[in-house]
């Protein structure tokens, strides 16, 4: 047991680095599928649904990582040891998302709403499933998109010709 601490400064460092690993992995899922939002052959809601589904499926396939991620994310330790790195890690995603929203919209708040709801609904599904994972995913997407679409630039929501 003591050997593992040779790789880390202390317990908090070990946990923060474990979170960073999970955070990078989740962000990688988001970014590797983000290009779907540029597919003009699909309407904007469908594009968002594809991206959401990839993220949802990843979370459902990794319940232990999800539980750790959520518990640490909402802890005091996250604020103290990992918040700054987390925000820097997501900076590129914030920038990518800006194109979908008017300048007056706080994109960080929108992304926080998306991720907070996604993670919360995924935790509910992992801990006490009421329906199949795919059905829970559809319901969660509807919940998120119903709010987010009110902030999206209208030109994104209009049918493409």
Regions found by a protein language model. Name each.
Residues 17, 31-61, 111-114, 141:
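Hydrophobic alpha-helical connector segments
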Residues 15-25:
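Alpha-helical DNA-contacting segments of helix-turn-helix folds
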Residues 25-36, 117-125:
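Solvent-exposed, amphipathic alpha-helical segments
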Residues 98-147, 151, 155-161:
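Hydrophobic/aromatic-rich alpha-helical bundle segments in the mid-to-C-terminal region
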Residues 8, 71-77:
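Short helix-capping/turn signature of helix-turn-helix
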Residues 1-13, 17:
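Helix-turn-helix
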